[in-house]
C-alpha cells in the first residue's frame, strides 16, 4: 500500500470513527496542512493538524480518482479537487488539498 493510499484509508477511518490518531501517526512532527480554495488553515505541526480535524471534522470520506484527484464518497463520480502529499523519511511532511469546481 502506498503512503497516499494508507493516508486516505486512515482519513476515511477517522471520518467514520472520529479517531484521527491512526492518520496522525503518518505525519512528521512538523507537517503542514494547507487548503487552497477554502478559507481554512494552514495548520503547522502534527498537533495543530490533529486539533483541526478534531474541532472541525470532515463529514464525508475521500475516494481517489487518479494520482492526484479525489472525490467525496457521496458524489464519487464528481471530482472535488486534488490531494498532494509530500513525503519525508517515509512519513507525510505536507498535505496540500485543492478544492476546485469542475464543470
Tell me what each language-model feature is.
Residues 1-103:
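C-terminal and inter-domain tail/linker signature
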Amino acid at each position: 500500500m502506498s503512503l497516499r493510499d494508507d493516508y486516505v484509508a486512515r482519513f476515511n477511518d477517522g471520518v467514520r470513527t472520529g479517531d484521527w490518531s491512526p492518520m496522525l501517526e503518518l505525519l512528521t512532527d512538523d507537517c503542514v496542512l494547507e487548503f487552497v480554495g477554502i478559507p481554512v488553515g494552514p495548520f503547522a505541526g502534527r498537533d495543530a493538524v490533529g486539533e483541526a480535524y478534531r474541532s472541525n471534522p470532515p463529514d464525508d470520506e475521500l475516494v481517489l480518482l487518479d494520482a492526484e484527484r479525489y472525490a467525496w464518497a457521496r458524489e464519487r463520480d464528481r471530482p472535488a479537487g486534488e490531494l498532494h502529499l509530500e513525503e519525508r523519511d517515509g512519513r507525510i511532511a505536507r498535505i496540500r488539498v485543492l478544492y476546485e469546481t469542475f464543470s
